[in-house]
Amino acid sequence: MASSLKKLISSFLLVLYSTTIIVASSESRCRRFTSIISFGDSIADTGNILHLSDVNHLPQTAFFPYGESFFHPPSGRASDGRLIIDFIAEFLGLPYVPPYFGSQNVSFEQGINFAVYGATALDRAYFVAKGIESDFTNVSLGVQLDIFKQILPNLCASSSRDCREMLGDSLILMGEIGGNDFFYPSSEGKSINETKLQDLIIKAISSAIVDLIALGGKTFLVPGGFPAGCSAACLTQYQNATEEDYDPLTGCIPRLNELGEHDNEQLKTELKRLQKLYPDVNIIYADYHNSLYRFYQEPAKYGFKNKPLAACCGVGGKYNFTIGKECGYEGVSYCQNPSEYVNWDGYHLTEAAYQKMAEGILNGPYATPAFDWSCLGSGTVDT
């Protein structure tokens, strides 16, 4: 009897211990971030594309009305104002993260942003080998990471603090990245194995995280993709779809959103695997999909117009979007109240949408695990 009781108690303690470990590993630990290091594409690009472009062939984001709600002279951001990364910086009390390209004095204190408009998760060689040669940037996620590794010794040499410690105190924003990997083949009408491509994208993101952990990275915010089936650009591309293809509530195309959600689930699975391998690291998934999708479901609740699919800046068609006549081109108009719009230019969102998304990620249900801000002396986010 005593032996059976002893076994029962031992089993109970083992279950209790295992449960404790699982709970602990699913919670983020509070950290006072001293900088933001960013990788990705146009969703986080704070101006790199401007400095990488030929002065005679500047991108649309170099022209008015980009930046008209906040920065005024266009900063290269693909919006009328601030991006999610900007609202994160504001909340943390940090400077807006400057673009790496074109910066004179790069430092951990300022933060560093390698994200580039049009960037892909996979290297350019992958697409060229498949006959996809769109006019897109060569600064893939791998290239961005290589540049960071090259400049890291110089960054650390300018400070008395340990290099690993400085990176450990940084919030590393890994994306969003991967959407362009699907967009470029689609825009050229190329057939691709979507499952295989998504596997390669996730592998590239995972590999980058592991490399940064080896360098001292401790906290990663890894966003999933947007609901592409609600994008004005995608809706215009699929405008010949039948009525049954659309969600009667939102007007989005569920099939496209479901594909994106499947990809996001795969990414989350990989992040959970990494979290188990590196229990001392915080890997936080940012649910960009659902953080944005709620605006299409209940636009008025969040302060948007009742028809949230149309672009604020654009011309023509049901969604105020025409390929070849996008925002920033001569003769293309923009709305006078961008804060009431979700979509800015057909591809990207307004500052108002990005702000509400940032709030939902920093202090809402759209980060897994949720951020712990207890060491900041505040339990709520005010962006």
Swiss-Prot record:
Its EC number is 3.1.1.-. One of its GO terms (biological process) is lipid catabolic process. The keyword Calcium does not apply. The keyword Secreted applies. The active site is at residues 42, 345, 348. CDD domains: SGNH_plant_lipase_like. Keywords: Glycoprotein, Hydrolase, Lipid degradation, Lipid metabolism, Secreted, Signal. Its main location: secreted. GO terms for cellular component: extracellular region. It holds the Pfam family Lipase_GDSL. It comes from Arabidopsis thaliana (Mouse-ear cress). Residues 1-24 form the signal peptide. This is GDSL esterase/lipase At1g28660. One of its GO terms (molecular function) is hydrolase activity, acting on ester bonds. Belongs to the 'GDSL' lipolytic enzyme family. Transmembrane segments: none annotated. Glycans are attached at residues 105, 138, 193, 240, 320. Gene3D superfamilies: SGNH hydrolase. It is found in: Secreted.
